[in-house]
Amino acid sequence: DVNLQGTINLCAALEKVGAPRAFIFISTVAVYGCDYGVNITEEYPLNGTTPYAMSKRLAEEYLQNWCRKYNVVLGIIRPSLIAGPNPPGNLGAMITGICRGRYFSIADGRPRKSVLMVQDIANLIPLLVRKGGIYNVCDSYQPTFRDLETLICKQMNKSLPLSIPYWLAKGMALIGDCLGCLLYTSPS
């Protein structure tokens, strides 16, 4: 797991060359485990249960202990959906899915998503180097998924994706999760 094991490996390497003054970790709002969220503060319980959310939460916990031990200023940023050139994560997967014709809109794309530009995150990092702390970061711009789909389709010269009902998407996800558990074999 890159988030936790990569963090542990990086800290071990830093111990050999000397701990830095500050460490900035880009986490995720997924650590809260909410399908939706309004006014979620940094004190909100960390209930994320997906492997991604859990790995980020465990990496945060590891860093909090490590930074305390080595007297390092720790800044943790928990961003929403990150946008920019070659976006990572869910937005990148959405773009790829639309381009390949393997993306379905859910519930007519009505849900909204806070979108944060990667440059905005970059602008925060120098501030956190001095101050540290944990910060949820989002933008006031909260387009619907249909807005995002329309923009992507227009830029990629693709047709808007077919929309499926929420209950069907949830059922398909559950079946996929079950199959994943049945078919997954641990690396030896």
Model-predicted regions and their roles:
Residues P87-A93, A107-V129, N136:
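Substrate-positioning beta->alpha
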Residues T49-R57, L81, S114-V115, Q142:
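Short-chain dehydrogenase/reductase
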